[in-house]
Design a protein with these regions (language model features):
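Histidine/lysine/aspartate-rich catalytic loop segments that bind and position anionic ligands
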Residues: 109-120
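Conserved non-catalytic scaffold segment of RNase H-like nuclease domains
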Residues: 1-108, 122-128
Length: 129
């Protein structure tokens, strides 16, 4: 079982930043069997380069749920799954950081599509989305 995820954050330093958006698709190897997506109010400012990159700004997040309000759903949809993400190391670390801030651990195996792309398509000049 896989949980394919994408996360947007307030900046590039996972231990200082917060999540602003998350999307997760639970995939059983044949089809998507569950999904969850939400903006998240990180309770901190978004760095200007991130606003420019993602289009997500603080005003959009004012009424969004806080991480603690969606944490249970994230645990449920990723339970018994391998997390799949582009640059999985960053997304996984910021998820772990957010759960640690709540006093909980979050442990999952990961697959990084950047590393897979580099292995399968070594001739490509770059691997960003």
């Amino acid at each position: 079982m896989y949980a394919i995820l994408d996360i947007e954050t307030t900046g590039g330093n996972y231990d200082e930043e917060g999540i602003t958006e998350i999307a997760i698709y639970r995939y059983n190897g044949t089809k998507v069997i569950d999904q969850f997506s939400s903006l998240i109010n990180p309770l901190k400012e978004i760095q200007p380069f991130v606003v420019k990159l993602t289009g997500i700004n603080s005003k959009m997040l004012q009424t969004a749920p806080k991480f603690f309000e969606v944490a249970k759903r994230i645990v449920e949809i990723t339970e018994d799954c391998v997390l799949v993400a582009h640059n999985a190391k960053f997304d996984y670390r910021i998820l772990q950081t957010e759960f640690r801030r709540l006093g909980f651990s979050f442990e999952r195996k990961t697959i990084c599509t950047v590393k897979l792309s580099q292995a399968l398509l070594p001739e490509q000049p770059y691997f960003s989305l």
